[in-house]
Structures are given as C-alpha cells and as structure tokens.
C-alpha cells in the first residue's frame, strides 16, 4: 500500500529534526566553567563544566576538561597576568576545529582530527561572574586594576587623575633609575633615605626651608667650612667677636 504524502512529509521532517537535534547536542560554542586547578608553567587549567549535558531525555554532568589553554590579555611583548585559583569562574569557548597541533607548536598547522566544536578544543577566559560570585563597588568613572574587595587598586580616571591605593605595602624597584617631574611633590609621612641626597639646579643650587629642629649626627659643611672642625682667629677674652671661621 502506498505511503500517504503527508506521512512522508512528516517522516522527513522528523528525520531532519532528529539530525538537527543530534548536531546541536554535539556542537559546542561557549559555556561557563569553574576552575579546578591551574598550571602556571603550561598556562593551562582543568575546568569543571558548569552546565549539565543532555543525553537522551535526561541531563548528565560532563567530565572535567583538562589541559585547557588559559587566555590572558597579551600583545606587543606585554601580558596582563593575574592569579588563577580553584573555584574561579570562567567562560569556555570551543574552537571550530581541532587545536592539538597549534597548541603544541603554534603557527599555522594542519588539523590532526576532523572533530568540530568539540569539548577537547576549549579555551578558558577567566572573569565571568555569576550573581553568587560577583564583585561590588565597580567604579563608573574610572578604569581600575583592583583586588576583588576593592581595598587595593590602581585607577586611571577620565579626568586624567591617576590614583594608587593599598592597605598593604607599596614597593617599586627601578634598576635603571627613577625620574619624577612635577611642579610640586608632597610626602605625607616619615621619610627615610638609604643613600646619598644631593640637590641639582646648577651652580646656583636651590633653596631649602625647614621648620626644624634639625639633628645631625656627623659633620655639616657650609661654604666648605666644617661645623665641627673649623677654627676662629682673633680669639681673646672679653666681649669682642672672633673673626670669621677658617
């Protein structure tokens, strides 16, 4: 008996839908993940997929993804890095084709496997935030490099002001020297200098004003005259004055 046309069409539609569902189920594009471990030497991580997979009519937990390359902002010989720890949230993105040879050798490579949009070809971008893990106090007027709690930050404001703040210690090391050019420099706090202190400005020098008191442990020289070792001529008893220091 011939099969009715409507039944044929229905069967074709069901077949096409089944194929589409199968392709959709196997195709990976992007999904959230949770870092389980990070290897700073290989710059890769192990990631738990944060969404369940679909198998048949039910859902199942996907196995952790291993050797996932971590993406740090990088270019022109400079890289922005930050700690990656267990529990950090990330976005997993999946390459169109197999990345094995590229990951091992860089450059332009052949695809060793015909797989596409596969779980094996993931990259991890650390930073997406669920509502359970989001930070607060985000500045709406400046760019900040900050700790999650906001206690320490480097800020570049739209008005050109730059601010550095930390409850901890600020350390700077410059082996090639340090130059600061500013109309005024204000230091609020005690200052300790481990090294020599000199004043430039050519032969005329510059002025120095201090409220004092000033305590000097060793000698002081003014105009080449030693405060400790200088002598005076014309010394005599009485109310007369000595001559200028030698």
Model-derived regions: residue spans:
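Hydrophobic packing positions characteristic
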Residues: 2-175
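Intrinsic low-complexity, repeat-rich intrinsically disordered segments enriched
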Residues: 160-246
């Amino acid at each position: 008996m011939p099969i009715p046309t409507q039944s044929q069409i229905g069967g074709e539609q069901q077949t096409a839908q089944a194929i589409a569902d199968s392709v959709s189920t196997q195709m990976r594009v992007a999904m959230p993940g949770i870092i389980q471990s990070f290897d700073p030497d290989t710059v890769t991580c192990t990631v738990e997929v944060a969404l369940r997979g679909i198998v048949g009519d039910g859902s199942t937990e996907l196995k952790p993804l291993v050797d996932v390359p971590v993406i740090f902002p990088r270019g022109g010989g400079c890289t922005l890095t930050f700690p990656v720890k267990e529990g950090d949230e990330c976005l997993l993105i999946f390459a169109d084709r197999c990345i094995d040879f590229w990951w091992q050798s860089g450059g332009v490579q052949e695809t060793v496997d015909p797989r596409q949009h596969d779980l094996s070809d993931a990259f991890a971008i650390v930073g997406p935030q669920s509502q359970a893990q989001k930070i607060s106090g985000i500045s709406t007027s400046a760019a900040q490099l900050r700790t999650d709690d906001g206690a320490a930050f480097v800020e570049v404001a739209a008005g050109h002001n730059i601010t550095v703040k930390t409850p901890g210690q600020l350390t700077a090391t410059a082996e090639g020297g340090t130059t600061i050019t500013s109309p005024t420099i204000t230091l609020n706090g005690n200052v300790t200098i481990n090294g020599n202190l000199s004043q430039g400005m050519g032969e005329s020098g510059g002025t120095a004003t201090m409220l004092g008191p000033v305590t000097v442990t060793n000698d002081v020289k003014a105009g080449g005259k030693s405060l400790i070792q200088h002598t005076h001529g014309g010394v005599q008893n009485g109310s007369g004055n000595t001559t200028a220091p030698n």
